[in-house]
Amino acid sequence: MDMKATEAMQDASSQQGSKFYRYGQLALLVVAAGTIYPVFYLRQVYQSSMLVAMGIDNQQLGYLYSSMGTAFVLSYLPSGWLADRLPPRLLITFSLFATGLLALWYATLPGFDYLPVIFFMGGLTTGLTFWAPLLKRLKSLAAKEEQGRFFGMLDGGRGVIEASLATIALTLFTYQTSKQGQSLAEGFQLVIHLYAYSCIALAILFALLRDPRKPAAVTETMQVQKGNLLADLNFLCRLPELWLMTAIVFCGYHLFWATYSFSAYLEQGGLGLSAAAAATVTTAKLWMRPFGGIGGGLLGDRLTPLRVLICALVLATLGIAGLIIATMFHGVVLAAGLVLFIGLMVYAIRGLYWAILDVCNVPVRVTGLAIGIVSVIAYSPDILLPLINGWTTQHFPGVVGYQIYYSYIVTMGVLGVIAALILNKRIAKRKAA
């Protein structure tokens, strides 16, 4: 065998090994993200049961999520700084283990005096030491032409994990409360325990794993060039594209937040669905995530992520507008269908809006910091929306409260479409220049 043939075989083997490594790392990130976040977002399936189990009302539930949102906003910028300096695997291991321990405390249903503390600390363990390390690690694994695919596979893949865990949890919850005659509180505790032990088991797995030797291309991408923090912040804040991206994520996150109240809307919005039936529909909605996330990502790589994102923003906004009027026709099937459709579009949005970071001219060495800057503003709805949702549904009981809340969400969806169109126009001008 001649020298050229040998080199060709070595190159092919190296590329195959690099691809196996990158997709293996992606799979681990997917499992971690799909397990850690549902712990504190069980309201999207069990909101009414949560209120009964914890002995609180809608407004108090809003305070809990607002406290967690405050922790998120405080965490995002330092999270980006940490992601630029510490190994992601260690940060992710800590996050999983700490979140699992918090979930065990949460499962004791300690009362409203302690619940805000649990939710605030949950915001730190899933925000400060997890969020930016997750996204920076993912961006470094994906080639330039794979950004949409990798981010879509992250969101879609974690959707498979979330939906699988949610289906198992719902089966246990229904069996214990319907067949075994246990209370809603006991059934809800069982659900929390499932997520708690899953997080702890994953933390042990990540702790035992050893970081494999990275291919040269990946190592080069991940190299950190230390710079002045204030200078880096000044540089990033002067990028118009980064601010437009922030607006897009901010508005898109409003659309996603609307899905958290779908279970309560189906149950309390005059449609007459039971807690189990509403939970079944919203669990089915979770299964839209792999289709929306992965499908949107693959389509984004073919057409550009931003174009697909614009279409998804428009359709999700129209879907929520349709949900506002669905109760006028008392259409259970229509409302359930809209919930699934909105879920599909919203998950496509989530799978794509971080992929557009690639067109914002952000250097690799400050990617984590850029993610932190965008996240601080774009995820601030974590503070405001729980309060808005809690106040409107508490002061305007039934369908009216949800119509007011969803009308605000639709307005934000329209603004998101406008921001995306402006960014698309700027990119087109830059390419034409």
Language-model segments: residues:
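C-terminal membrane-cytosol helix-exit motif in multi-pass small-molecule transporters
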Residues: L170, T174, A196-T219, A419-N424
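Glycine-rich segments within core transmembrane alpha-helices of 12-TM secondary carriers
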Residues: G148-T174, S375-P386
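Cytoplasmic helix-loop-helix junction between adjacent transmembrane helices
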Residues: I118-G157
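C-terminal transmembrane helical hairpin of 12-TM major facilitator-type secondary transporters
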Residues: T304-I356
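Flexible cytoplasmic inter-helical loops of multi-pass small-molecule transporters
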Residues: A5, R210-A231, A432-A433
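Extracytoplasmic gate region of multi-pass secondary transporters
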Residues: R43-Q47, A166, L239-G293, R350, ...
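Cytoplasmic membrane-interface "Motif A"-like loop-to-helix N-cap segments
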Residues: R85-L96, D301-L315
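Helix-to-loop junctions at the C-terminal end of transmembrane segments
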Residues: S75-P87, G292-P305, T393-Q394
